[in-house]
Amino acid sequence: MIRTEHLSKRYESVTAVDDVSFEVRPGEVLGFLGPNGAGKTTTMRMLAGFVTPTAGKASICGHDVETEPLAAKERLGYLPEGAPSYGEMRVRRFLEFICDLRRLEGARRSARLDYVIEHLQLASVLEQSIETLSKGFRRRVGLAQAIIHDPPVLILDEPTDGLDPNQKFEVRALINEMARDKIIIISTHILEEVDAVCNRAIIIARGRIVADDTPLKLAARSRYYNAVSLQLERPDQLAAARAAVAALPSVADVEVSERDVRLTALPRSGAAILTAVAELASSKGLVLKELHLESGRLDEVFRSITA
């Protein structure tokens, strides 16, 4: 388990992290979200033992990060911001160096090297120096060093930063695979990543936790939760459709996009309006291209509570 208790970090007059407490248990993939400067990276550095807290404490698998640093770090895989490494080293030598530091030997060493090379698709760059790699490959090398010793806890700061869409998909699949028996914290500003791999999300703003829930429940706070979107075949029906939908008692507002010939009905207090809107469309003879029920928009919730 990862545990933080009243964790704070101050730099003279600036409070970067302010009284943060949470726990993460095995099987949880926690998305750590926040705007730039919110305190995400500072919190992760304190968890990883790279920054000393001003107050409070953090532990990894029961080992205090300050008083038992080696025991805590043995159980931790950490991908820092920017994926720093030794640029002059070849990729193969760097991974072997990490194996030495992690005291991996014999068959287990070979197996773990093979695992990270295969799953992060590093075979083609093993003999290149790290400084010559693209940003995406450097990120994958950084992730490889974090997981090579198969730790029970992973702390990953922007793990898909710099990756192309195919590489992002592969790394997210790997995270989902590892999530079965590990504790994983992912710091990200990519909200689609939270939907793709996380079963819990914490939002931090101005150094404090402002939300802690599942992505689905956070999205349900959105005014678009249970909203119904209709795309019409005929632009000439748009104005009448808007007026008819707006007159429904359970509809709070209607947004219109003339370019897409689309209207979105927003419910009052998250009410279920799909049936009423669908029946109205049928009774009014609206010719539809699409009828879509929204589950909420995490980006809108994020903006509303961090602004």
Question: What residue ranges belong to the model's regions?
Answer:
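C-terminal coupling/interaction segments
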Residues: R268-A307
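Short phosphate-engaging motifs
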Residues: A16, E193, Q237, I273, ...
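Short, surface-exposed acidic/glycine-rich loop or hinge patches that mediate macromolecular interfaces
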Residues: H63-E66, I209, P235, R268-A271, ...
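Preference for bulky hydrophobic residues occupying beta-strand positions
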Residues: K9, F22, L230-L232, L263-A265, ...
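ABC transporter nucleotide-binding domain
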Residues: V171-L266
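A short linear hydrophobic-aromatic micro-motif
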Residues: Q121, S250-E255, V287-L291
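ABC transporter nucleotide-binding domains
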Residues: I2-T4, K9-A205, I209-A211
